[in-house]
């Protein structure tokens, strides 16, 4: 810009912002995907671009439990792959080697309580909150929390469970006897079902929604996109809601059994 020089940090901040716009801007051809930059050190108030040393200093001094969970999904997808691998190596001790005690478990419970409060504010009434595929009771986020909160404390000495893919991680947790075969089957089946529901909801107008329609016709249309059909016994929407409640109910029961606030939970006993 007119021969002016800028710092490397400022250069990469601007570059990241432009890439984010290019990926998430909605055009006549749609968009690539939505980008959320809030999952970075200091959140929305933090720098967009950090040096590797900057990341390491932050994680060693101020890293939080939720960031340990989030980093389980980290993977280099573009640019300098060698630098990406160095980042993963740097982050590994922060994820797996720090203690995961009852305080950390309470922080995970706090994450869930925060989600529940936000849902209560956005969607009044227990019935409406239950219709949120991602954040509602027994939804996608509870499955992910189950997986990630087991991976962090046990992944240090059991590298077999360090899987980024949720379905593969569930199988690995089963193989290491951290969840039962029945729990693995229940959670895997629910995860596939709920992700399918999420996709069918969002394919309409590329909407970023996770809530089941309230309107009866829209709910029926969603059920039919999922393959449900009316029969002599029940309508497509009724069949879909029955399966939805079964899956989410089973997930929530497993979540509460492992991490529930009532002590002693199954997980709290294992980390004492």
Model features per residue range: what roles?
Residues 1-272:
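A nucleotide- and high-energy phosphate-metabolite-utilizing enzyme signature
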């Amino acid at each position: 810009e007119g021969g002016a020089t800028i710092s490397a940090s400022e250069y990469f901040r601007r570059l990241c912002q432009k890439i984010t716009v290019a990926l998430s801007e909605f055009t006549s051809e749609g968009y690539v995907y939505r980008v959320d930059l809030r999952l970075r050190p200091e959140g929305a108030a933090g720098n967009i671009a950090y040096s590797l040393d900057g990341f390491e200093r932050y994680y060693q001094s101020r890293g939080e439990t939720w960031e340990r969970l989030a980093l389980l999904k980290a993977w280099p997808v573009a640019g300098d792959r060698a630098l990406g691998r160095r980042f993963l190596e740097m982050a590994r001790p922060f994820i797996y080697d720090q203690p995961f005690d009852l305080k950390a478990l309470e922080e995970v419970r706090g994450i869930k309580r925060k989600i529940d409060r936000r849902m209560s504010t956005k969607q009044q009434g227990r019935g409406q909150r239950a219709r949120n595929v991602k954040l509602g009771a027994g939804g996608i986020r509870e499955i992910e929390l189950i997986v990630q909160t087991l991976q962090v404390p046990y992944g240090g000495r059991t590298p077999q469970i360090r899987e980024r893919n949720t379905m593969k991680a569930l199988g690995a947790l089963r193989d290491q006897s951290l969840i039962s075969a029945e729990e693995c089957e229940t959670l895997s089946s629910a995860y596939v079902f709920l992700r399918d529901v999420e996709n069918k909801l969002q394919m309409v107008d590329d909407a970023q929604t996770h809530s089941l329609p309230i309107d009866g016709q829209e709910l029926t249309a969603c059920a039919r996109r999922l393959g449900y059909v009316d029969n002599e016994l029940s309508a497509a929407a009724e069949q879909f809601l029955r399966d939805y409640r079964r899956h989410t109910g089973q997930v929530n029961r497993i979540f509460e059994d492992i991490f529930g606030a009532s002590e002693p939970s199954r997980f709290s006993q294992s980390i004492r």
